[in-house]
């Protein structure tokens, strides 16, 4: 663990309780003499705290140091992924986070699994996964998450995003990944959706094998940093 997340990190005093308390003081057995590095995952600063008190169900911390220390990928990457199984989204989130993806937009394509619902509770769960990943890899800013109800909404929001499909040019490392790369579901895009893409740059992955959506995400996130 590179640091501990707390939404109020930077305050002169902090209270640690609940899940964070259990993890730090019962699982990891942090002692009162130890100092803790905390982040709020918003401002890029690393805040160092010392212990003022460790009680049975909470700990009180006192701020003793502040250091500007941003840890992010060199290039910004925005992935626009059609909704796949929730469990598969959850599996790839830590990988995308470690590869420096700056934003993940989810949308329902024509061939998306409609029984997979992306609501505020799901987005909150995704954010928790990303927070734990940041604590492990050291990333200093949280990935942005959002959801759209259909393909046209996502296209309207990101008019310069490119598309990953089977019939495009080979995806170059020089592509503008910050403007967004649209990745379809397992069944690909419908003919109607392909009609929406006529004015957009179409790319393909230079492999003869058919990749799952989550594999395509990791591939794009990786090549974006080359």
From Swiss-Prot:
GO CC annotations, alphabetized: cytoplasm
NCBIfam families named among the record's database cross-references: PRK11713.3-3, RsmE family RNA methyltransferase
The entry's keywords: Cytoplasm, Methyltransferase, rRNA processing, S-adenosyl-L-methionine, Transferase
GO MF annotations in UniProt: rRNA (uridine-N3-)-methyltransferase activity
InterPro entries linked to this entry: Alpha/beta_knot_MTases, RsmE, RsmE_MTase_dom, RsmE_PUA-like, tRNA_m1G_MTases_N
Organism: Helicobacter pylori (strain J99 / ATCC 700824)
SUPFAM superfamilies in the cross-refs: alpha/beta knot
A GO BP annotation: rRNA base methylation
Official protein name in the record: Ribosomal RNA small subunit methyltransferase E
Family that this chain belongs to: Belongs to the RNA methyltransferase RsmE family.
Parts of the chain that traverse the membrane: none
Localization: Cytoplasm
Protein task: Specifically methylates the N3 position of the uracil ring of uridine 1498 (m3U1498) in 16S rRNA. Acts on the fully assembled 30S ribosomal subunit.
EC class of the enzyme, as a word: transferase
E.C. designation(s): 2.1.1.193
Chemical reaction(s) catalysed: uridine(1498) in 16S rRNA + S-adenosyl-L-methionine = N(3)-methyluridine(1498) in 16S rRNA + S-adenosyl-L-homocysteine + H(+)
């Amino acid at each position: 663990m590179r640091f501990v997340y707390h939404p109020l990190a930077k305050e002169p005093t902090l209270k640690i309780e609940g899940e964070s308390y259990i993890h730090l003081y019962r699982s990891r057995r942090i002692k009162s003499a130890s100092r803790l590095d905390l982040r709020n995952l918003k401002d890029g600063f690393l805040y160092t705290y010392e212990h003022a008190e460790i009680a049975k169900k909470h700990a009180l911390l006192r701020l003793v140091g502040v250091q500007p220390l941003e840890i992010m990928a060199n290039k910004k990457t925005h992935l626009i992924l059609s909704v796949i199984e929730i469990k598969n989204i959850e599996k790839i989130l830590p990988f995308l986070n470690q590869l420096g993806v700056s934003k993940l937009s989810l949308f329902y394509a024509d061939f998306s699994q409609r029984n997979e619902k992306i609501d505020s509770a799901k987005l909150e769960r995704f954010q928790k996964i990303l927070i734990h990943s940041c604590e492990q890899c050291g990333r200093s800013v949280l990935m942005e998450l959002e959801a759209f109800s259909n393909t046209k909404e996502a296209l309207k929001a990101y008019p310069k995003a490119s598309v990953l499909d089977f019939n495009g040019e080979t995806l170059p490392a020089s592509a503008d990944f910050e403007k967004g790369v649209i990745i379809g579901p397992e069944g690909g895009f419908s003919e109607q959706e392909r009609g929406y893409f006529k004015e957009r740059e179409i790319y393909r992955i230079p492999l003869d094998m058919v990749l799952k959506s989550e594999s395509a995400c990791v591939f794009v996130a990786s090549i974006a940093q080359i």
